[in-house]
């Protein structure tokens, strides 16, 4: 059965650490499924007319997380969408009520690879500390058990292209979504 038909329009939520490739992979996945693509961080910046960094600095992480939940609730009302979420979206239990209405895919990336990807990134407010490896390990420890609640886990290593990761996701979706049996199949 074709993956699109199997999905029946449900949303796909990409979760994982910052730098895991949620936005890059999400855009390609949405294209392949003929879905819309949303990035919750970009939506937050549009709604607030501030950068994520500025929200953290001027209003704090708690306010940011509240805005993030509001944005997630609004995008969850859409269908046929791939949604790249912020790395900490899993921390709020209310967010899980929205995520569970779709297919949750965790992009699992090693700390070593994340460090390589994020070493020169100055836009991430949670990475302002001097020891990037320690900060990433701490965030990973806080979130790993929550990420593990995903319907599907895709392990990403350095040698993979975004296209190959999307192909793996598309091949794996039928293993976690079972086709609905239609009543007329038994007539």
Curated annotation (Swiss-Prot):
Its main location: cytoplasm. It comes from the Bacteria. It is found in: Cytoplasm. CDD domains: SK. Keywords: Amino-acid biosynthesis, Aromatic amino acid biosynthesis, ATP-binding, Cytoplasm, Kinase, Magnesium, Metal-binding, Nucleotide-binding, Transferase. Pathway: Metabolic intermediate biosynthesis; chorismate biosynthesis; chorismate from D-erythrose 4-phosphate and phosphoenolpyruvate: step 5/7. Its EC number is 2.7.1.71. The keyword Nucleotide-binding applies. GO terms for cellular component: cytosol. ATP binds at residues 19-24, 124, 160. Binds 1 Mg(2+) ion per subunit. GO terms for biological process: amino acid biosynthetic process; aromatic amino acid family biosynthetic process; chorismate biosynthetic process. GO terms for molecular function: ATP binding; magnesium ion binding; shikimate kinase activity. It catalyses: shikimate + ATP = 3-phosphoshikimate + ADP + H(+). It is an enzyme of class 2 (transferase). Its cofactor is Mg(2+). Mg(2+) binds at residue 23. Substrate binds at residues 41, 65, 87, 143. HAMAP family: Shikimate_kinase. Monomer. Catalyzes the specific phosphorylation of the 3-hydroxyl group of shikimic acid using ATP as a cosubstrate. This is Shikimate kinase. It comes from Rippkaea orientalis (strain PCC 8801 / RF-1) (Cyanothece sp. (strain PCC 8801)). The lineage of its organism: Bacteria, Bacillati, Cyanobacteriota, Cyanophyceae, Oscillatoriophycideae.
